[in-house]
A protein has these predicted regions:
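Structural motif corresponding to the C-terminal cap of alpha-helices
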Residues: 14, 174, 268-272, 299-300
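Core mixed alpha/beta domains of very large multi-subunit molecular machines
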Residues: 231-243, 256-258, 263-266, 270, ...
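Helical catalytic core of nucleic-acid polymerases
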Residues: 197, 201, 207, 227, ...
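Histidine-centered active-site/metal-ligand motif
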Residues: 245, 249, 255-256, 298
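Histidine/acidic-rich helix-loop-helix segments that form or flank divalent-metal centers
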Residues: 243, 247-249, 272-287
Length: 300
């Protein structure tokens, strides 16, 4: 996991920019320097992990199976702590790097696709060649461009409240965020600070999203993918990519939590007769924000 994301980015960059190295892409402004550094750090970590797997298995195997994780962790100088095993600490870092690499590569692939759409004369396998962009009227400073939410003013600097508004719109409409908006949000994450977290406006906006029956997990997952959720709720940030080798957690704690809320969304949207009783009980809850917040925090 992870390395193939980078390979795809490099292959695509050769087609769209004629460049196939991060250094070249940074120099022409295709990738911000901060993203290139994060990609390089993730690539370095994942390559060392793959090499350790090859050394331990004495063959070209890229499968990081459970029985190898503890020894790979030891070889990479991880040690047990009173709270966690070395393998859990190692896998936490592994998932962080793989997650970051996937998100960064996905963002830049979206940007490359958008660039190709704007220059249909340069047709390639990567271009969808739309004849024109479809733009919906602006609402609250945001617009819909070809089904993606974007800022109406491309020079706007977002703050925490504006980002919360964007997530709320995306949750309500089911729209994706444009690559440009995602990058703008990444740059604005420092504004998600203690002052913003403590504001009544932020609390009310977040609780409103938790009351959107059947759509809660989608909004939270989008927040999480862009690192907003962990900044807004530092307690959740601390369990991001947290691995627990026990009988209860097949996934990392953050993924386990989001899947739990997705199960509740599935119940709200279900028409199955076998779930009718549970759906009826759920429909009687006047304010589901407390329930969703409890699920969000149940493993913290």
């Amino acid at each position: 996991g992870g390395l193939r994301d980078l390979h795809e980015l490099m292959w695509t960059s050769r087609v769209t920019h004629g460049k196939a190295t991060l250094k070249d892409l940074t120099e022409i402004g295709a990738i911000p320097e901060r993203d290139a550094k994060a990609i390089n750090a993730a690539y370095d970590f994942l390559t060392r992990v793959r090499n350790e797997i090859h050394f331990l298995t004495n063959r070209k195997s890229d499968l990081l199976s459970l029985d190898l994780q503890q020894q790979v962790a030891r070889n990479l100088r991880y040690a047990d702590t009173p709270e966690q095993q070395a393998s859990e600490l190692f896998m936490h870092d592994y998932y962080l790097h793989a997650r970051r690499l996937h998100r960064l590569c996905e963002t830049h692939l979206q940007r490359a696709a958008a660039k190709q759409e704007k220059t249909p004369e340069k047709k390639s396998w990567f271009s969808r060649s739309r004849s024109s962009s479809r733009i919906a009227p602006a609402i609250g400073g945001f617009v819909m461009r070809d089904g993606e939410l974007d800022v109406a003013d491309t020079n706007e600097t977002l703050d925490g409240n504006r980002m919360m508004m964007a997530f709320s719109y995306a949750q309500a409409t089911g729209a994706n965020l444009s690559s440009a908006l995602q990058e703008t949000m990444q740059a604005a994450l420092p504004s998600v600070n203690k002052t913003f977290r403590s504001s009544p406006e932020a609390a009310q906006a977040f609780l409103k999203m938790l009351r959107a029956k059947g759509r809660v997990a989608a909004g939270l997952r989008l927040m999480h993918e862009l690192d907003f959720l962990g900044k807004f709720l530092p307690e959740f940030g601390r369990v991001t990519c947290l691995v627990q080798h026990d009988l209860y957690h097949r996934y990392t704690v953050d993924e386990h939590t989001l899947r739990t809320i997705e199960a509740l969304d599935d119940l709200a949207n279900s028409r199955s007769k076998t779930l009718e009783r549970y759906r009826g009980v759920f429909s009687q809850i006047a304010d589901t924000a407390t329930l969703h917040l409890g699920l969000l925090m149940h493993d913290i």
